[in-house]
Amino acid sequence: MELFQAKDHYILQQGERALWCSRRDGGLQLRPATDLLLAWNPICLGLVEGVIGKIQLHSDLPWWLILIRQKALVGKLPGDHEVCKVTKIAVLSLSEMEPQDLELELCKKHHFGINKPEKIIPSPDDSKFLLKTFTHIKSNVSAPNKKKVKESKEKEKLERRLLEELLKMFMDSESFYYSLTYDLTNSVQRQSTGERDGRPLWQKVDDRFFWNKYMIQDLTEIGTPDVDFWIIPMIQGFVQIEELVVNYTESSDDEKSSPETPPQESTCVDDIHPRFLVALISRRSRHRAGMRYKRRGVDKNGNVANYVETEQLIHVHNHTLSFVQTRGSVPVFWSQVGYRYNPRPRLDRSEKETVAYFCAHFEEQLNIYKKQVIINLVDQAGREKIIGDAYLKQVLLFNNSHLTYVSFDFHEHCRGMKFENVQTLTDAIYDIILDMKWCWVDEAGVICKQEGIFRVNCMDCLDRTNVVQAAIARVVMEQQLKKLGVMPPEQPLPVKCNRIYQIMWANNGDSISRQYAGTAALKGDFTRTGERKLAGVMKDGVNSANRYYLNRFKDAYRQAVIDLMQGIPVTEDLYSIFTKEKEHEALHKENQRSHQELISQLLQSYMKLLLPDDEKFHGGWALIDCDPSLIDATHRDVDVLLLLSNSAYYVAYYDDEVDKVNQYQRLSLENLEKIEIGPEPTLFGKPKFSCMRLHYRYKEASGYFHTLRAVMRNPEEDGKDTLQCIAEMLQITKQAMGSDLPIIEKKLERKSSKPHEDIIGIRSQNQGSLAQGKNFLMSKFSSLNQKVKQTKSNVNIGNLRKLGNFTKPEMKVNFLKPNLKVNLWKSDSSLETMENTGVMDKVQAESDGDMSSDNDSYHSDEFLTNSKSDEDRQLANSLESVGPIDYVLPSCGIIASAPRLGSRSQSLSSTDSSVHAPSEITVAHGSGLGKGQESPLKKSPSAGDVHILTGFAKPMDIYCHRFVQDAQNKVTHLSETRSVSQQASQERNQMTNQVSNETQSESTEQTPSRPSQLDVSLSATGPQFLSVEPAHSVASQKTPTSASSMLELETGLHVTPSPSESSSSRAVSPFAKIRSSMVQVASITQAGLTHGINFAVSKVQKSPPEPEIINQVQQNELKKMFIQCQTRIIQI
């Protein structure tokens, strides 16, 4: 259609129709095409594709008209319906301001012989000049003063920034789609119910997904049939349409294409191979729309953030099959403060205040989709636990039989980048998938309908959600194709079809992620290729950091634009964003200057923790370990800290999930054989990085090495200079010991190291990062490496040979929290048959009142590096002979005990692992016990009597009263009878009082805080209590629901977690402790339900500050909820 500019109007005309847009008040009206003759000096500006609507960026500013400048054909849906994507828009100010360069395609009728638009419209410089002149005239006419001039400039700047975000929203993300003949807002099933509806397309759309409804409101209110032509319903989301050929003899062409660019289909395909059309349509709800940290949870209307309906269409011959899934934020009132990296989620309203809005959300969902299968992927421990517990509690309160709640801890099951373990979920809910069916339509009508829907969510409903939705949709598609005879019954999808299908879902995840978080989806490489690769891990780190950066000062503008598009008043003071932006820029510059200092402090903190007092610190570097053999073959590309002392080097590993160092190795320099530096080993393509391989011996055996590389900020660098500098430092240090260390430059062989031995694990009792988040570190590491590189040429290596003069720097480090627990992995075959010869007595001191779990500041852990007292040395000497592998690490007061097999830390995957269980190590913390006082817990259990060891911690929130944090706070012996249990409860109360009294007496004497005495209590007869262990880690355990767990269910006894589980840094919900493959609490007999309830309720412990009666009421309330619950609860 043609766009004309007149004195008072912009006129859109096609054929006999014309739409006049007023440049005075922004009004829209329909007029005949012949009225163009009445316009004052109309000029044709070019061609446009359609009208999106109009928007007012500020109440004091004019309206803007948004037009489709350029579109791209996505494909054709069944019925030959074309689907188009908006690629470029044009924005016109509905005012007297002259339009700037619109770059429109020229109309051949009015611009015959003119190819360049600048010949008929002013140049950009002229437009800017006119704009400035017009603004200047306006300000002069209104008799300005300084205040008004400043306000005018701020309004212009604000309008400019919002307009910039509007253009980026439409053109950068390419996330708006439309069809002139097909209803993209409704699924095939919903469309099939109203096939005979004669209303125009825009009146039949689903209001939830009609994204430009408010912007085009002037036209929808006209009410005449003539307006139908101008209204184009749009969706925000994703659409991709592909035709696949089922050919099992065709190669996948993996070597000829990258994951981002699928191989081209052959132009000539045999007719004997069946074809089918696959379409993926994602529709984002316009209700509670917005950006990641600006929109979370539910609102007062029951709408949730990031709600997306995804439909997968399969079309074969005349048959169309549809399967629909949804995603959406957890429907409770929660938020995350987005101005810090990886902010901690928090609940904004109480449980009772949330119930009504939770019910409103699911009542609407059940009304639309009939049944709901909730798949909750949030972590059942750690910082996400508070949201998962709130979700489960609301489900129990909602108590609807049409709801099914499935909990799947994605990070726990897929730890170590084993994302293929998602099949565990699809296998567990396979029957539910088949029972849900799908919509099947042919020319005659509806054959069957989908009965229910999967509602998948994680915290952001992005990365994890997309992987799981793709897995479920694939199961459904394979069943559909087999029903239609396109696929053989026992054959999987052909490799080439599978690859294109994976790319479609990966693109879907990227598009939704860009709309909500501003960057592409993490884990997208797994969705594309089915495996996790090095490039994907590194890209995830960059994208995660980008999300944080974007949120700092861009999300506020984008959120304001989205709200204005939907007619929602902007509540945030947009003018204050300018100040925030300046503050951020200043802070960013300051952070750049202090990168070196931050990394230095981080290295110093771990140096103080890991290095003994008799070793001297020589240097530390931030690197990446490329060797896949740490713990198991799935650990790749782990961020590490390499610390060098005068006699050893330490490799400290970062955990992706908890964002802190949780394990390290100490390797003697005497065992360091050689260093190799060269290009990284690759199968295809040119190596991008240089790597350093440190070869070492273990028990006189070779074949062990670490492959490390530097993280460089500049992609053009390979980090070789940094690695050479590190290698020279290692060489000099070893030469100072009287031995030489060869440095060899060569192309590294593609091989794996032998499994590393003696890996020591560090776990923090408190929540939060130990120093900084992993991805924050990645952005800092390159600064350190760059610093090393720059100083290399200025350092005289010869002067560094006398390394005996290095002293451990005295620096106060406030990164570490004092409560630490450590696990030691021992790769010793004797551990497999060894008895559990002792149980560690744990003493946990009260935390300082000012230490919050959501605080960025950390108290120093100075006692770890202070010199030991004589009493401590005597205690250490007395404990060194505790057991065959029990020993003391005198450098930091760590006491090791015998191993306990089947610990949680070994549950790396669902498959068997050759790695042995860690020994339990407890780090002493100042307990306040006087020198002459004996710990009340200093007793050894015997077979004749039962005693309870309690170590309560302060609850993090209200749900800690109801969902016990027994995995990190409490160790409880079991009683075999109820009478004995009551007696043990009395003993526990007396013991707690004794600890309190001794603490008071010690505070009166003002004894300084120092490490407490820890005694290791041994039991020659092994454990005297039941425990729930992972099935794969205990040899005698035949099935997931074996002796211990079944006995517990039958007797109703309390279950004591294993020491390693109790020392975990993640607070685990009660359902996370169920280690069976699946537990269902519903739709079973009353007796079986009672057993299940007793199991769940047994996990609800009491907190010491709570009165006995309150805890009993809470326990009874939870038990009653489970008894009356009609919702099926499934834990996988």
UniProtKB/Swiss-Prot annotation:
Name of the protein in its database record: Phosphatidylinositide phosphatase SAC2
Stated role: Inositol 4-phosphatase which mainly acts on phosphatidylinositol 4-phosphate. May be functionally linked to OCRL, which converts phosphatidylinositol 4,5-bisphosphate to phosphatidylinositol, for a sequential dephosphorylation of phosphatidylinositol 4,5-bisphosphate at the 5 and 4 position of inositol, thus playing an important role in the endocytic recycling. Regulator of TF:TFRC and integrins recycling pathway, is also involved in cell migration mechanisms. Modulates AKT/GSK3B pathway by decreasing AKT and GSK3B phosphorylation.
Gene Ontology process terms (BP): adult locomotory behavior; cardiac muscle hypertrophy in response to stress; clathrin-dependent endocytosis; negative regulation of axon regeneration; negative regulation of tyrosine phosphorylation of STAT protein; phosphatidylinositol 3-kinase/protein kinase B signal transduction; phosphatidylinositol biosynthetic process; phosphatidylinositol catabolic process
Catalytic class of the enzyme: hydrolase
Tissue and organ expression note: Ubiquitous. Highly expressed in brain.
Annotated GO MF terms: inositol monophosphate 4-phosphatase activity; phosphatidylinositol phosphate 4-phosphatase activity; phosphatidylinositol phosphate 5-phosphatase activity; phosphatidylinositol-4-phosphate phosphatase activity; protein homodimerization activity
Domain SAC: 167-518
Top-level taxon of origin: Eukaryota
Localization per Swiss-Prot or TrEMBL: Membrane, Clathrin-coated pit; Early endosome; Recycling endosome
Catalytic reaction equation(s): a myo-inositol phosphate + H2O = myo-inositol + phosphate
PTM sites of type Phosphoserine: 827, 830, 878, 881, 907, 910, 1103
Domain (hSac2) ranges: 593-760
UniProt feature, compositional bias: Basic and acidic residues: 856-874
A Pfam family the protein falls into: Syja_N
EC number of this enzyme: 3.1.3.25
One cellular component term from this protein's GO annotations in UniProt: dendrite
